Amino acid sequence: MRLSEVEAYGGPGQDPASHTYRGRTPRNSVMFGPPGHLYVYFTYGMHYCANLVCMPAGTGSAVLLRAGEVIAGVHTARVRRMPHADGPDLEGLVRRIPDRDLARGPARLTVALGVVREHNGSDCCSGGPIQVHEGRPVPSGQVRTGPRTGVSAGAETPWRFWIDGDPTVSPYRAHVPRRRGRAAS
């Protein structure tokens, strides 16, 4: 996979949108480990998201893998995106997913890669099951920055990075505050 979009998250006390904002917990402890390790978490009761630890051990910051282009294993990624499809219609259903949508968004990306909770803490730089390799450079003029998607605290921080014009980049969605129900009178 060639990454096309990421979001950065700072360490304790720095970034209110980060899982480490209030310090180390059993859930976020991987983010305090060495760089190059995968921090995987379950969100909204239905999706996994994957972050790559990016600062020295003890720092507690990572980069959310938001979107990418599947460049190898396209058929496998398609099948993973259709986990409940089977039978004679499987191939037809699998082909309906446009290439650009296979890993467009953090949950789709983890499904396309086959990332699950058991990958939490995996070393992506030294031969683990999920590996990161340097790809072809993107000209700096094609890299854009802006506010992170869907976060409320720290929403104004321009730590979302994407390749301009890349069709695999997920659409920007500003955080929409939840409407609280009115108290009964």
Regions found by a protein language model. Name each.
Residues 1-185:
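Conserved, well-structured core segments that form or line functional sites
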